[in-house]
């Protein structure tokens, strides 16, 4: 094996490592660090009219409970940005639950559980946002 061949293999490996490392170091790949999430303002008079009904959901209890929570507290869910980012066109955590997307995304489900837990503790929207930012921001 010649020195040129060894260097070309080494160079190829370094280039491959760079291709893998550069995206991993970018803010979009890693998440936002500890910046606050871009939480939307809840829309006045928002309802859960568009949240998927129970008959359209899988039998998994955790999923059904998250959708039920979105139906019970649409004003809170509409003021929280969904930290999973799997559907960036969604306006808020509430709009995630207007589709079947959360049935396969435990990021949405976990965020819903956190919102529900903090609401049961009597936390305000600002406090719930801070808890979401602390966990996911």
Label the model's feature ranges:
Residues 1-8, 18-23:
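N-terminal secretory signal peptides
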Residues 24-65:
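C-terminal segment of N-terminal export signals and the immediately downstream linker at the start
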Residues 50-89:
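Short, charged low-complexity linear segments at domain edges
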Residues 74, 97-98, 103-106, 124-129:
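Sequence context surrounding c-type heme c attachment/ligation sites in exported
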Residues 80-115:
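Short, thiol/selenol-centered motifs that function as redox-active sites or metal-ligating centers
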Residues 111-137:
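Short Fe-S-cluster ligation motifs
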